Amino acid sequence: MAELTIRPEEIRDALDNFVQNYEPETAVREEVGTVVTSGDGIAHVEGLPSAMANELLRFENGTMGIALNLEERQIGVVVLGDSDGIDEGSTVRGTGEVLSVPVGEGYLGRVVDAMGNPVDGLGEIKGVEGRRALEIQAAGVMDRQEVREPLQTGLKAIDSMIPIGRGQRQLIIGDRKTGKTAIAIDTIINQKGNWESGDPQKQVRCIYVAIGQKGSTVAEVKGALEKAGAMEYTTIVHAPASDPAGFKYIAPYAGSAIGQHWMYQGKHVLIIFDDLTKQAEAYRAMSLLLRRPPGREAYPGDVFYLHSRLLERCAKLSDDLGGGSMTGLPIIETKANDVSAFIPTNVISITDGQIFLQSDLFNANQRPAVDVGISVSRVGGAAQIKAMKSVAGTLKISLAQYRDMQAFAMFASDLDDTSRRQLDRGARLMELLKQGQFSPYPVEEQVISVWGGTTGKFDDVPVGDVLRFEGDVLEYLRSHSNVLTTIRETGKFDDEAKDAAAAAFEEVKKGFKTSDGKMLAGHEEFSPMADEDIDQAKIVRAKKG
């Protein structure tokens, strides 16, 4: 057997010859696929064996698509745009890229589509700082820290009983036309004070993702934000109802990518998904057209993962990563107040709490129509300032007892004094929690209102006059006391501040007139008696004596 010898000079000569004759263009083989079938926003393509999952593909007419189904012989592609010109036999090429959107400060104040392109007619977006992939891994356990900084919504019913913290995922759920979007918009407007402070630790950048909404609805939202001066720190990502299902599917991920860019820079972000029900329906339509096996309610098996991988990106990052945060307010629309349906239960299990809006309360003019009984925040008091935590501790149980007592009182004719007082105070607390749209309250004013309600300062005020009396008290405190400033700066509501607030309530009561023109009980004005009346009174007393 011949001995095997290795000659280094032969190996070196072979390598030198290969390098000298190497031509780069012959090394890269461009794959070209062919459309087999096309329709309903879905194309089946053959001939791209190296395509990646979620890779961007370019059709012959320039339209882009996402490779969602990688089968043995075909690729199922979701078309991102107009399907005209995508016919059987037309060519498809891979780009080697996954879907991404531009990110940066230039997006503040703009309205963009699901691909990050401006649609507000204000020209190109300036200040783009790069691109970020839509499908990006959420922060790991060790990259996060606990949620403990409050994110104020400006709504008394939420900030007092269902507090939201920076980095939390809080679901807003309810039937159509119950005020879900109004809560989200009020929360954005309430961040204006923080933005104007100029303090990066206080400022919150807001992203409103409109999924499958009417164009008129989004225009209305944009107009409300502009009127309130909130558009300068807000980005609207718009995937209207007229868009193909693919755009509604990717829009939440596009908004999340824009927000994550700021979060990893150590900034604070609020993102609103309005609403994820429509995203799930778009994903269901795509999956059925791609012939994926349907499951419960015809949704595909991975619809839970659709929302979990999106909402898990909301986090409060560790200090090592800059301490930024992204707070998520996903919105889910129910049918007939059924929270046990598939998508609502999925998102409830993913999020850190839910705000349930009841249509009966909304129709009874109790707005925001928050059902305190089944609404909860799993972060709880950790996301409240000390002042609010100290005054709101008994509010939720007081309202729960009021609801029980109210149901009992419908069938009971005689109630003892304690029960009647409980009913009277509960009615005033419910009135106190009413709030007009686009009129968020600063947290220090909320503290005064909640404290006054829970300590009986409104008990002698007629229910119909509670909000007017509250406004008078807050106006008095703004001009006659530094109580509000103390709460805002220290976050505490000490005994001295309570005494000053109690004095303000009493002072306002002296001059407050109810809607029927009367003074409050114990604060009536008595005019001096005329001389003849005094003489007559003396005669009457003398006769009795």
Curated annotation (Swiss-Prot):
The answer to keyword Transmembrane helix applying to this record is no
Membrane disposition: Peripheral membrane protein
Q: Which InterPro entries match?
A: ATP_synth_asu-like_sf, ATP_synth_asu_C, ATP_synth_asu_C_sf, ATP_synth_F1_a_nt-bd_dom, ATP_synth_F1_asu, ATPase_a/bsu_AS, ATPase_F1/V1/A1_a/bsu_N, ATPase_F1/V1/A1_a/bsu_N_sf
Recorded hits in CDD domains, A to Z, give:
ATP-synt_F1_alpha_C, ATP-synt_F1_alpha_N, F1-ATPase_alpha_CD
Q: Which Pfam families match?
A: ATP-synt_ab (PF00006), ATP-synt_ab_C (PF00306), ATP-synt_ab_N (PF02874)
Quaternary data:
F-type ATPases have 2 components, CF(1) - the catalytic core - and CF(0) - the membrane proton channel. CF(1) has five subunits: alpha(3), beta(3), gamma(1), delta(1), epsilon(1). CF(0) has three main subunits: a(1), b(2) and c(9-12). The alpha and beta chains form an alternating ring which encloses part of the gamma chain. CF(1) is attached to CF(0) by a central stalk formed by the gamma and epsilon chains, while a peripheral stalk is formed by the delta and b chains.
Q: What is this protein called?
A: ATP synthase subunit alpha
Q: What is the lineage of its organism?
A: Bacteria, Bacillati, Actinomycetota, Actinomycetes, Propionibacteriales
